[in-house]
């Protein structure tokens, strides 16, 4: 299980969230998932870190059926809902039915099949047999309401979306 703690401490895998507003959003999503029928595997909640102030939260994993719509919001934390499916088509339909599309992962022994499936996900980044791997030189953005076009400033192409060119020439000030 992921270890919550102070981010500079060795062994910490999950640091504090940025502020109380984000903590409230995450805890609210955890409660809503249970209200919608999600069964806790790891129940989440707040975490106490001895001697440290901060907004620490435990990881949360829930089991649900696809019809429960247990992903009420995009939660940026160690939060997952596991929905068993009967086949690949159902998995793709479930993944592509949300308004979110930041990233997806396909885990398989058959790399060719994994790449074919990755092409069918509606997201900005899809990875096969890895997750959250970002390479410089490739854009990192989402689809739908996740991230938005050009959201990931990770290469020259996306960096220029946020800049305006300007040249300033300076000569030595002439002596009087």
Residue ranges and their predicted role:
Residues 56-176:
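Conserved C-terminal structural/oligomerization subdomain of aldehyde/semialdehyde dehydrogenase
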């Amino acid at each position: 299980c992921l270890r919550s703690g102070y981010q500079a401490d060795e062994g910490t895998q999950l640091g504090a969230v940025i502020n109380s507003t984000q903590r409230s959003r995450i805890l609210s999503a955890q409660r809503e998932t249970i209200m919608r029928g999600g069964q806790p595997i790891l129940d989440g909640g707040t975490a106490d870190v001895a001697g440290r102030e901060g907004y620490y939260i435990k990881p949360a994993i829930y089991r649900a059926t696809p019809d429960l719509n247990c992903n009420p919001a995009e939660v940026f934390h160690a939060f997952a809902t596991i929905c068993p499916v009967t086949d690949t088509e159902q998995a793709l339909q479930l993944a592509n039915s949300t308004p979110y599309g930041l990233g997806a992962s396909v885990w398989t022994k058959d790399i060719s099949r994994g790449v074919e499936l990755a092409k069918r996900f509606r997201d900005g980044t899809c990875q096969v047999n890895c997750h959250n791997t970002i390479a410089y030189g490739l854009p990192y953005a989402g689809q739908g309401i996740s991230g938005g076009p050009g959201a990931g400033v990770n290469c020259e192409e996306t960096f220029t979306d946020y800049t305006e060119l300007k040249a300033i020439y300076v000569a030595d000030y002439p002596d009087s």
